[in-house]
Amino acid sequence: MRTLFLMTVVLVGACGATNDPINTAQPYIGLQERQDRKTIREFVGVDPVRTEWCAAFVNAILEKDGIPGSASVSDYPLMARSFLEWGDPVEPKDIQRGDVVVFPRGTEGWLGHVGFYVETQGDKWVILGGNQENQVRYDLYNPKRALGIRRYTPPVATVEMSTIEHLNTE
């Protein structure tokens, strides 16, 4: 009688994810919602003239990188604040390039804006996003206004061990 050990490794995650949304977004910088309406609509899936599209842009970039967007955690993925439930929370002192940052917008408590952190310049954060002055561009934001910072962390591999006894190997 022999004992055979079987090990199954299950990798769960975003295969092929680059995790650098700033590089992924480069070809879209400068696109304007009216002038480039068709291109933006095809990429983000909404009409940028009729819909606030910052969250759609972030979701489209994440999807292009093989990363699940806010639709994986929210029934309202087109709302910037849906990203407050996405990924893992990050403290401002630990912010890194590519982290998703959510800011308030307007006076309504449900409104917001979302984009990707690029770097710090002085006392401001450089944020790359869609629907910033009606286009894809870099803008400076006050970090004290951030509602939340989130980061995608790929799931780790899980390992299952099982034992098969009384295996006849003849």
Report the location of each language-model feature:
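Sec-dependent N-terminal signal peptides
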Residues: 3-13
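...with weaker cross-activation on analogous glycine-rich loops/strands in unrelated enzymes
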Residues: 22-23, 68-137
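Structural motif marking the loop-to-transmembrane transition
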Residues: 1-4, 50
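N-terminal capping segments
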Residues: 13-71, 153, 161-170
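Extracytoplasmic/periplasmic, Sec-exported soluble proteins
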Residues: 17, 46-54, 90-93, 107-109, ...
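General structural signal for secondary-structure boundaries
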Residues: 17, 36-39, 73-82, 91, ...
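Active-site signature of cysteine proteases
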Residues: 124, 128-156
